[in-house]
Curated annotation (Swiss-Prot):
<dbReference type="GO" id="GO:0004853">
    <property type="term" value="F:uroporphyrinogen decarboxylase activity"/>
</dbReference>
<keyword id="KW-0963">Cytoplasm</keyword>
<comment type="function">
    <text>Catalyzes the decarboxylation of four acetate groups of uroporphyrinogen-III to yield coproporphyrinogen-III.</text>
</comment>
<protein>
    <recommendedName>
        <fullName>Uroporphyrinogen decarboxylase</fullName>
        <ecNumber>4.1.1.37</ecNumber>
    </recommendedName>
</protein>
<comment type="pathway">
    <text>Porphyrin-containing compound metabolism; protoporphyrin-IX biosynthesis; coproporphyrinogen-III from 5-aminolevulinate: step 4/4.</text>
</comment>
<keyword id="KW-0627">Porphyrin biosynthesis</keyword>
<comment type="similarity">
    <text>Belongs to the uroporphyrinogen decarboxylase family.</text>
</comment>
<feature type="binding site">
    <location>
        <position position="206"/>
    </location>
    <ligand>
        <name>substrate</name>
    </ligand>
</feature>
<comment type="subunit">
    <text>Homodimer.</text>
</comment>
<keyword id="KW-0456">Lyase</keyword>
<keyword id="KW-0210">Decarboxylase</keyword>
<feature type="binding site">
    <location>
        <begin position="25"/>
        <end position="29"/>
    </location>
    <ligand>
        <name>substrate</name>
    </ligand>
</feature>
<feature type="binding site">
    <location>
        <position position="74"/>
    </location>
    <ligand>
        <name>substrate</name>
    </ligand>
</feature>
<dbReference type="GO" id="GO:0005829">
    <property type="term" value="C:cytosol"/>
</dbReference>
<dbReference type="GO" id="GO:0006782">
    <property type="term" value="P:protoporphyrinogen IX biosynthetic process"/>
</dbReference>
<dbReference type="InterPro" id="IPR038071">
    <property type="entry name" value="UROD/MetE-like_sf"/>
</dbReference>
<feature type="binding site">
    <location>
        <position position="325"/>
    </location>
    <ligand>
        <name>substrate</name>
    </ligand>
</feature>
Amino acid sequence: MLKNDLFLRALKRQPCSRTPIWVMRQAGRYLPEYRAVREKTDFLTLCKTPELAAEVTIQPVDLMGVDAAIIFSDILVVNEAMGMDVEIIESKGIRLSPAIRSQVDIDRLIIPDINEKLGYVMDAIRLTKKELDNRVPLIGFSGAAWTLFTYAVEGGGSKNYAFAKKMMYREPKMAHMLLSKISSVITEYVLMQIEAGADAIQIFDSWASALSEDDYREFALPYIKENVQAIKTKYPDTPVIVFSKDCNTILSEIADTGCDAMGLGWNMDIAKARKELNDRVCIQGNMDPTVLYGTPDKIRSEAAKILKQFGQHTATSGHVFNLGHGILPDVDPANLKLLVEFVKEESVKYH
């Protein structure tokens, strides 16, 4: 039995004594303890070494008091498992090769044996669960098909997604073939994470805002729904969070995927989102990550505002406090600790 199950209760929209909190990229460079581990090895080796991945996954639980851990990994391990070379060079960026630009390139990508290619993630999950000793839940995750597609086709990050959109608009069947291939791997990957012990899954569609509403409906949402429905069919009790960054105009359609919770970017009023969704799903978010550069008073006032905007809880509401995107690497850890402690205290009156 979990000693602290507030995060899972909130995702399932069950009564909670307060609002749970964790933050995206909470195991990361803002922590001196993470940097000490990271100095010994490169980023991908850290992801692939279960003992080290477990250590950094647990750091924010020990140091910050967050209500959930998220397994330390990277969304691009899926691309790598499918046969792409992935280089992640902090401060320089991401390179994937060869970029996927033709039918021949798509055919060359493999549907991997997840245990063989991504077994290190499952080992890290099992080890982390053991070391957490039921203190808090553990989140598993994957990138969404559209986001992984953009990295594959662009060969890295991009400002305007020219190659990805060129394939979408000139060769839509080819684009769907690649998206479908990626999505099938994502589905197997997240199911195996749950089998290994993940208590919840988050699907990150980090580049969702690059698409128009209509294009998102065609090239992104069907694959997210495919992933969510596969999880719900096999593991109906495992909550799923969908984080489609800045897709504020189609919130109800994202909820229609069958997800339990929706991550919200910071440019959406959480009160409006709750009103539109009518407590059909839990809402996760949504403080601007740069607020953590502010004074203690500013951090407290912004957090208080979000809690107040979400408002009083009902028997069917759910809110997980988080940032609207990942914590930035040069944030003072003391500011995150202050935020966590404040949310724990301030949120009680809304429950």
